[in-house]
From Swiss-Prot:
SUPFAM superfamilies xrefs: Nonstructural protein ns2, Nep, M1-binding domain
Further information: Average number present in a viral particle is estimated to be 130-200 molecules.
Pfam families registered for this protein in UniProt: Flu_NS2 (PF00601)
Assembly information from the UniProt record: Interacts with protein M1. May interact with host nucleoporin RAB/HRB and exportin XPO1/CRM1.
Any single GO CC term annotated in Swiss-Prot or TrEMBL for this entry: host cell nucleus
Gene behind the chain: NS
Name by which UniProt lists this protein: Nuclear export protein
Keyword list, A-Z: Host nucleus, Host-virus interaction, Transport, Virion
Domain of life: Viruses
Family note: Belongs to the influenza viruses NEP family.
Keyword Iron-sulfur applies: no
């Protein structure tokens, strides 16, 4: 995984965890959890691509990996919409910057996962 992507994930997760958005803190915790899950999935997919012939072990481990891939894209779309919504309603510049960076990171990760998945097909 690109070291910049790792540091971006860590930075955004740390900053999001420090935010206090009032009644929506539960929503924010859910977003943080999904970001972490997405990072782990992206890492595992990237490692699978790095190992030649790993498609077979990936299929053996999870016969429905294409379905799982589709679910991850749904999660990414949901997170993008949630981050866009938070960006629209927040007036705090620190939060706006964090959400803009989170949005950019989601687009990058979506593209990376697409690239990895095409390499595995």
């Amino acid at each position: 995984m690109d070291p910049n992507t790792v540091s971006s994930f860590q930075d955004i997760l740390m900053r999001m965890s420090k935010m206090q958005l009032g009644s929506s803190s539960e929503d924010l915790n859910g977003m943080i959890t999904q970001f972490e899950s997405l990072k782990l999935y992206r890492d595992s997919l990237g490692k699978a691509v790095m190992r030649m012939g790993d498609l077979h072990s990936l299929q053996n481990r999870n016969g429905k990996w294409r379905e799982q891939l589709g679910q991850k894209f749904e999660e990414i779309r949901w997170l993008i919409e949630e981050v866009r919504h938070k960006l629209k309603i927040t007036e705090n510049s620190f939060e706006q910057i964090t959400f803009m960076q989170a949005l950019q990171l989601l687009f990058e990760v979506e593209q990376e996962i697409r690239t990895f998945s095409f390499q595995l097909i």
